[in-house]
From Swiss-Prot:
The keyword Phosphoprotein applies. InterPro entries: A-D-PHexomutase_a/b/a-I, A-D-PHexomutase_a/b/a-I/II/III, A-D-PHexomutase_a/b/a-II, A-D-PHexomutase_a/b/a-III, A-D-PHexomutase_C, A-D-PHexomutase_C_sf, A-D-PHexomutase_CS, Alpha-D-phosphohexomutase_SF. This is Phosphoglucosamine mutase. Its cofactor is Mg(2+).
Length: 440
């Protein structure tokens, strides 16, 4: 596809992502949707370019007869929830997630708050390039209205995911909202539940989103957790669909260890649907062993929360995630939601009766050794003579491997993982030399 990437349409604002592109994309989306209520919800993060893109989207949608509800800066998962809750035909989020301020993006949701399938995205692209839209007459043009009080609906929804018999009284929590979409909603939720909240990076100016802040730079949160002697710290990214946790010692909790602890928490409460968890191919093998030892099945997907969700639907699961911090509790959210994940993490912490440094350290990770090699071509890996035999050899040694081409560069990415770091290095050297001889 020419426009859509792994998570909507994304690029440099004003260069790739122009108002013309946004307007046409909005019309294409609107004309592909089944029209029921005639309403589409639009939200955004805190980037300056959000104003430009929002107005272009509204222009395109009203031109083809839709009424638009604009709700201002809100997390991506809030758009997913509110689209369904407010009976809209579709939802649009303007955000480039964890990218710098100069990028922006457009994410689409159907009337149930689900991200679009690849087939639906292809349909939108086809409409976009046909460039022949059904513009409405002056009497049929849609209207737009801005609603600023929907934040309350989302707060009530998020708080409903937290156990009613638990409160956060006496707990000190540092929140890093990355100067992004959750800068108002995150501290409100934790304060209402009784926590002593210290918020950092909560003064967006249109340019400072994700800048040395949030889930991409948790080292700043780590310093503040120590400085304020907090029990735990949570870092979100620009659109609050990702979570990074810092324990009371100022240590960043590994993403796979976080997934393991949350799966353990659900399992102990008999809330883990079909006793299974969806993770990606990047998750550490030690997580899989830890879960298997409890009788929990592990299913792996391609990288991307969208693919994790596909596996969750296919296997009828209610929990999954990526080591990068996209965690999906599908009983409460249709997509990764950093705030739902943070509330589940703190509920587990309180009920464990332990310090965060112990509660989230339930197993040791296997060493992972990685390398990239430059390639001059990208033939299918299964067609390279001798590749299957070599990879089988790695597996026979009891080591896991991941060999894949980069989606954006002329590189082959290699990973070997297992109990011994030295053995993993030795096997990686073998793989590196073999693929270099075949592809460089």
């Amino acid at each position: 596809m020419k426009l859509f990437g792994t998570d909507g349409v994304r690029g440099k604002a004003g260069e790739f992502l122009t108002p013309f592109l946004a307007m046409k994309l909005a019309m294409s989306f609107g004309e592909c949707l089944p029209k029921k209520t005639g309403k589409i919800l639009v939200g955004k993060d805190t980037r300056r370019s959000g104003y430009m893109i929002e107005n272009a989207l509204v222009s395109g949608l009203t031109a083809i007869g839709y009424d638009v509800i604009q709700i201002g800066p809100m997390p991506t998962p809030a758009i997913a929830f509110l689209t369904e809750d407010m009976r809209c035909d579709g939802g649009i989020m303007i955000s480039a997630s964890h990218n710098p301020y100069y990028d922006n993006g457009i994410k689409f949701f159907d009337s149930f708050g689900n991200k679009l399938s690849q087939e639906f995205e292809e349909k939108i692209e086809k409409r976009y390039f046909e460039n022949n839209f059904n513009l409405k007459t002056e009497k049929e043009i849609g209207k737009s209205k801005r609603i600023d009080d929907v934040i309350g609906r989302y707060i009530v929804h998020i708080k409903s995911s937290f156990p009613k018999h638990v409160n956060l009284n006496g707990m000190r929590i540092v929140l890093d909202t990355a100067n992004g979409a959750a800068y108002k909603v995150a501290p409100t939720i934790f304060t209402e539940l009784g926590a002593d909240v210290i918020t950092i990076n909560d003064e967006p100016d249109g340019f400072n989103i994700n800048q040395n802040a949030g889930a991409m730079h948790p080292e700043f949160l780590a310093k503040k957790v120590l400085e304020y002697r907090a029990d735990i710290g949570f870092a979100l990214d620009g659109d609050a669909d990702r979570l990074v946790v810092v324990d009371e010692k100022g240590e960043i909790v590994n993403g796979d260890k976080l997934l393991g602890a949350l799966a353990y928490y659900l399992h102990k409460q008999n809330k883990l649907k079909n006793n299974g968890v969806a993770v990606t191919v990047m998750s550490n093998g030690a997580l899989e062993k830890f879960l298997n030892d409890m009788g929990i099945k592990v299913y792996r997907s391609n990288v991307g929360d969208k693919y994790v969700l596909e596996v969750m639907k296919e296997k009828d699961l209610n929990f999954g995630g990526e080591q990068s911090g996209h965690i999906i509790f599908s009983d409460y959210a249709k997509t990764g939601d950093g705030l739902v994940s943070a509330l589940q993490a703190v509920a587990y912490l309180i009920q464990s009766g332990k310090k965060a440094s112990e509660a989230f350290d339930l197993f040791e990770l296997y060493p992972q050794i990685q390398a990239n090699i430059q390639v001059s071509s990208k033939p299918p890996l299964n067609e390279i003579e001798g590749a299957k035999e070599l990879l089988d050899e790695v597996e026979k040694e009891g080591y896991r491997h991941l060999v894949r081409y980069s989606g954006t560069e002329n590189k082959l990415r290699l990973l070997v993982e297992g109990e011994s770091e030295n053995k993993a290095k030795e096997l990686l050297v073998k793989l590196k030399e073999f693929f270099k001889s075949k592809l460089s």
